[in-house]
């Protein structure tokens, strides 16, 4: 079977990680291609037999070129879809999904579109309008959260709840144990939605002994990095800013706790990856699916959005009680089978067969 994925870029994001993981898993038995909009190389390793196609690049430096190049890119996408005959197209992320629906007009190949953020994350009124207008014309839509499934079923005929696979499921034995260090992690883009400021303020509200005895690391890059470094200094907290990192595994192996501070999420990769490394997860009750991944006080902890005091109290609770932390991560490991690549791959193939035979 010929399967073609479409995505804007293969940078270090969570959705990009998922696409590469799926492509690598499917290419062992199927012919897999990836069409991407941007010229940059894939941040994640692709198997050699995955065909990578980059659309023609256009200028975006002036208003005229921004408008003209969007139209040219749409035509380039349509041309690529025509030239790469496939049994199914699978597009990732909202604006790419919209572009693919319009670019596929008149083509018979079924299109599955895949959402990787909560529906509320898309703020632009124009893009929300285009999403509402175009999504009914896809052949199927995959979503990550139960609330998103309910939302999209109002206007999309076939909506499937498909969790993200975790590439660590083939690398890490669930019987494996890790020598932990006094390390607390924040991993993610440094932007307003991920709210890393909350992490810094929570550290500042910790017991002083804990601040001295633990290392706090921010792994990720983005528009707020410089501001956050100044913020850490002004709060008087010691935080290491590592920037974008390739070997996140080494951090998970050492870390005792991971903090997620987002306002809006789909199915956060870090809350899944950390399961395999016995990292205790503390997350905001982000809009609108934290309960899909964490049962509060059983296999992790939930706190209110932007509530740094609550985050600090949960951190103190876990960091002062190692047995509690171990109990939490033991319970959390039970979720790992939900994200095994073989399990998710099977679900994707079932959905592909469904749209092909519809």
Tell me the role of every PLM-derived stretch.
Residues 5-13, 17-21, 25-65, 151-153, ...:
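N-terminal strand-loop element at the rim of the active site
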Residues 296-297, 301-308, 317-322:
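Conserved acidic donor-binding segment of nucleotide-sugar-dependent glycosyltransferases
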Residues 280-284:
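Short hydrophobic beta-strand element within catalytic cores of glycosyltransferases
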Residues 16-21, 98, 182, 186-205, ...:
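A conserved mid-protein helix/loop that constitutes part of the nucleotide-sugar donor-binding site
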Residues 91-97, 115:
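Short His-centered aromatic/hydrophobic patch
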Residues 147, 165:
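Carbohydrate-associated surface elements
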């Amino acid at each position: 079977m010929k399967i073609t994925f479409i995505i804007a870029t293969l940078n270090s994001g969570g959705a990009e990680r998922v696409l590469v993981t799926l492509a690598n898993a499917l290419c062992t038995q199927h012919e897999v291609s990836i069409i991407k909009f941007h010229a940059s190389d894939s941040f994640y390793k692709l198997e050699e037999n995955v065909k990578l196609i980059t659309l023609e690049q256009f200028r975006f430096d002036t208003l005229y070129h921004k408008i003209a190049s969007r139209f040219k890119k749409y035509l380039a996408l349509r041309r690529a879809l025509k030239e790469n005959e496939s049994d199914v197209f699978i597009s990732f992320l909202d604006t790419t999904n919209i572009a693919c629906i319009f670019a596929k007009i008149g083509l018979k190949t079924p299109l599955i579109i895949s959402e990787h953020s909560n529906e509320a994350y898309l703020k632009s009124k124009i893009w929300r309008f285009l999403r509402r207008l175009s999504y009914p014309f896809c052949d199927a839509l995959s979503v990550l959260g139960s609330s998103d499934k309910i939302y999209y079923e109002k206007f999309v005929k076939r909506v499937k709840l498909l969790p993200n696979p975790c590439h660590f499921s083939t690398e890490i034995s669930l019987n494996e144990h890790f020598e932990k260090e006094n390390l607390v992690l924040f991993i993610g883009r440094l932007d307003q939605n991920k709210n890393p400021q909350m992490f810094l303020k929570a550290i500042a509200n910790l017991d002083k002994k804990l601040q001295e005895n633990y290392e706090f690391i921010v792994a990720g890059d983005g528009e707020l990095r410089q501001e956050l470094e100044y913020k850490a200094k002004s709060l008087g907290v010691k935080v290491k800013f590592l920037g974008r990192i390739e070997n996140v595994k080494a951090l998970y192996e050492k870390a005792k706790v991971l903090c997620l501070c987002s306002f809006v999420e789909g199915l956060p990769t870090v809350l899944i990856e950390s399961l395999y490394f016995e990292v205790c997860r503390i997350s905001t009750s982000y809009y609108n699916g934290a309960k899909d991944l964490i049962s509060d006080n059983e296999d992790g902890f939930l706190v209110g959005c932007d509530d740094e005091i609550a985050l600090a109290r949960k951190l103190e609770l876990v960091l002062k009680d190692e047995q509690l932390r171990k109990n939490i991560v033991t319970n959390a490991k039970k979720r790992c089978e939900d994200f095994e690549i073989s399990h998710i791959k099977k679900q994707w193939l079932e959905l592909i067969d469904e749209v092909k035979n519809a």
